[in-house]
Structure formats: C-alpha cells, structure tokens
UniProtKB/Swiss-Prot annotation:
It comes from Symbiobacterium thermophilum (strain DSM 24528 / JCM 14929 / IAM 14863 / T). One of its GO terms (molecular function) is phosphoric diester hydrolase activity. Zn(2+) 3 binds at residues 178, 223, 225. Keywords: DNA damage, DNA repair, Endonuclease, Hydrolase, Metal-binding, Nuclease, Zinc. HAMAP family: Nfo (MF_00152). This is Probable endonuclease 4. Zn(2+) 1 binds at residues 65, 105, 141.
Length: 276
C-alpha cells in the first residue's frame, strides 16, 4: 500500500506535491476545488506538468476528491446540471494533475426514496460520462448512512455501477470510518468482510482507501472521523485493517482531524508503525 494524507492545493499543485513528500507521503489526496462549492478554476497546464514531474520524481500517487456539496441524486434539474458541469471540471482537473481517479460521494435522495435516488444517480452519471470523455475514472465512495445518504452497502454501489451505460469508467473508494459507522463490518470480522467484498466484485474495483478511525460506534450511521487509534476502531482495529494485506497496491490516505497539515506527518508514521 501507499500511505499518505489529504493535502491542500491552495498554494498550487507543485507545492502540494512538495508538501506531501515532506510529510513522508507515498500517496496524497486533494480537493479539485473548494469542497463546499461548485465554482473552481481549470488546472493550469504548466503547473500541472510541474506537479506531475515531481510526483514521478518522488514516486507519489495522487487521488482527487470532488466537493462534498455534489449530490448525484438531486431531484432539482438545475442543481443536477450544475453538479454535472462541476464534476466534469473535477475529472478534467484530476486528469491534468495525473490523479488515479476522482472520488465522489454517493448521492442523497433527500426524501424521494432510495429507489428514486439510485435511478437519479444512474441518470446523472450517464450524463456526466457522456460530457466528460477523458481517461480519469470516477471513484464512488461508500457512506455512513447519515440522513438520506445512499451507498452504505457495497452491493448498492455495485448495483449503481452495473446500471450505468459505461460502467468501466467507474470504480470505488473505500472509507474505513464510513463502513464501520454504517455497520457493515467490525475489525474482528474484517477478513470475512473482505472475502465477501472480493466475491461480489467490489474489491477488484477498489482504487483508493480513506483510512479513518470513527468518533462514533459501529452502526451509528454518523460520519465523524477520528484520529487513528483514538476512535471506536482503536489501535488494534486499525492495525487489523493495515496488516491484513487487503490494501496491497492501493493509495491509502488519512482524512483524520488536524489543525495543520504538518500534524499528518507523525500520524502517517504511526500508521506505518502498526504494520510492524
């Protein structure tokens, strides 16, 4: 696996790559734009090229993340159109920066019902993948199940992907906190969980992992990340996940609560120590 964390690109993509390297990252994640909005700039070709060259020099892998505000299942036609345009730009920027994929949360049905939410998501994804013709895959992320969130179960993610017209352009990102809070695994049954995920085809489509502890207990359906070893997964639980070999070959990035990016350095080192 390639361990790392989330890095800001507010000072430019090349600087983000330098910051990731300085913190001891082997992989890093970045937001394509402000995570709370739809407005963003297209990637600067020169800066993107410099960043990609640095990534190659340092052996870094990058993962992009679309804004949290994106709702693939919105029933509002205007908001759907805005979301598609925004995600198209996210994918274009992710491709320019050399990211292995662009993460997007599963949709929220906002009271319209789960069946509607899934159908609307498929429609939105079809329109998006018709508009964006590049090579960067969209990585759908599992959710904790807060409110009307879809995508708590792996089977649901697989179903949505199977219904899309171009499923080969969609893969997955697995969040350890979300899945635990959704109640779909415990550390003590991790091996069985991964075996099931492999059996249904999900694990073979996994391209990135978010390594987070959980501030709330198993099945709480609350999306609140905790620092590694400080939540309900605990040190033993995080160690179980890391030592299992399930994340072999994948970028594994921390999205844990920090006041400053520099705090990620010791936490990445801590994660590596759990592999011993």
């Amino acid at each position: 696996m390639k361990l790392g964390c989330h890095i800001s690109i507010s000072k430019g993509f090349p600087q983000a790559v330098e910051n990731a390297h300085r913190l001891g990252c082997e992989a890093f994640q970045f937001f394509t734009k402000n995570p709370r909005g739809f407005k963003g700039k297209s990637a600067d070709p020169e800066a993107a090229a410099r960043g990609r060259a640095l990534m190659a020099e340092y052996g870094l892998v990058a993962v992009a993340h679309a804004p949290y505000i994106t709702n693939l299942s919105t029933p509002d036609p205007e908001l759907q159109a805005i979301s598609i345009a925004s995600l198209k730009q996210d994918l274009e920027n992710a491709e320019a920066y050399g990211a292995i994929g662009c993460v997007c949360h599963m949709g929220k049905h906002v009271g319209e019902g789960e069946a509607y939410g899934r159908a609307r998501m498929v429609e939105t994804l079809n329109r998006l993948l018709e508009a964006y013709t590049g090579s960067c895959p969209l990585l759908l992320e599992n959710t904790a199940g807060m409110g009307s969130e879809l995508g708590t179960h792996l089977e649901e993610l697989m179903e949505v992907r199977s219904r899309v017209e171009q499923p080969e352009r969609i893969a997955f990102c697995f969040d350890t906190c979300h899945a635990f809070a959704a109640g779909i695994y415990r550390p003590e049954d991790w091996e069985d969980f991964v075996a099931h995920a492999r059996a249904i085809g999900y694990w073979g489509l996994l391209r990135a992992v978010h390594l987070n502890d959980s501030k709330f207990d198993h099945g709480s359906r609350k999306d609140r990340h905790a620092n590694l070893g400080k939540g309900f997964l605990g040190e033993a639980g995080i160690a179980t996940l890391l030592r299992s070999g399930a994340f072999e070959g994948l970028p594994v990035v921390l999205e844990t609560p920090v006041k400053d990016e520099a705090e990620y350095g010791p936490e990445i080192a801590y994660a590596r120590s759990l592999l011993q």
